[in-house]
Amino acid sequence: MSTGCCRAPSRGSAPGVSDPRADALQLIRSANVGPITYRQLIARFGTPAAAIEALPMLAARGGGRAPLLADPRLVAREFATVEKLGARHLFLGDSDYPELLAELDTAPPALIVRGKLSLTQRTCVAMVGARNASAAACRFARQLALGLGEEGVTVISGLARGIDTAAHLGSLARGTVGVIASGIDIAFPPENRELQGRVGDEGLLVAEQPPGTEPLARFFPSRNRIIAGLALGTVVVEAAPRSGSLITARLAAEAGRDVMAVPGSPLDPRAQGCNLLIREGATLVQSVADILEAVRPIDLRSVRSPVNGFGGGPAGDPGDAERATVTRLLGPVPVSVDELIRQSGLAPAVVQTVLLELELAGRLERHAGGRASLG
């Protein structure tokens, strides 16, 4: 679905919608504004409205044209469509935004949710695995999900074929969360349309993309980070070494969450990813008790305060020499932000501001693991 961008920074507001929320959605739906950039803009300018006004200036400093701003009329239409679907928008900084997800530097600034958001306030465990999973693996995944539900644990998965489907079916009665890579009104795969509807009715359905968005391949890694971010730990049940499930496990590890895996036969390619995770230190899972033992000790850990979606204050501007220093250190090969700070000798806030300007100018690409490169 097109976000309907326009160059003029029109400041209209959606009828019946408070200005800060309409501004927040317009900002995140605008070109070159991703989750990290959104956080930095709010931290720097305080409100989405102030950030929108500053976008042309920041893009010019980064050497690019003013970014395309989302059309306020389409923002208003999105609010209306979501309401008609029986869903609502949830913004970073809202009091009921999931705390574990808010810990991520890449936490989605806006989600669309339908169902029982309170499920995210319980102990949450993600369960992922192969789409072409064996019957035995699907049966075991369903048993694990059922057992976790009986222990009051919310099971999170991605509504894909195979292990995801088994995880949702096993936990539907006690509480499950489905995170999808499409708009909340699009069922993928099509055969899971009924299951997706039940998850929204009886559990919680979560989407980052606006309604009408088809599940393009590039949206699945983003979906996976939400699955991992909502949970204290991720369980992998059957996965090839180069599967999306291992991407979810890696994202969980990068977020400081527990990674668990069900071992399998070394003769089955579908088990090689799980066996690799165990060899690298993942918790071996043979029962519900193994999962509970892994996540319960960290269930009461302190959680970093979520970003206030509409608060903050301005930061200082970098000079031309500082911009040149950071830009010179960048190239086509991704480099970590920590390395840029170390090599430049500049304050972290200065480096982050230069990267923000470059991204808004369309000259910077963000990569997993806090890395960046020139686009």
Give names to the regions the model predicted.
Residues 16-20, 91-375:
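Glycine-biased, small-residue-rich flexible motifs in mid-sequence functional cores and linkers
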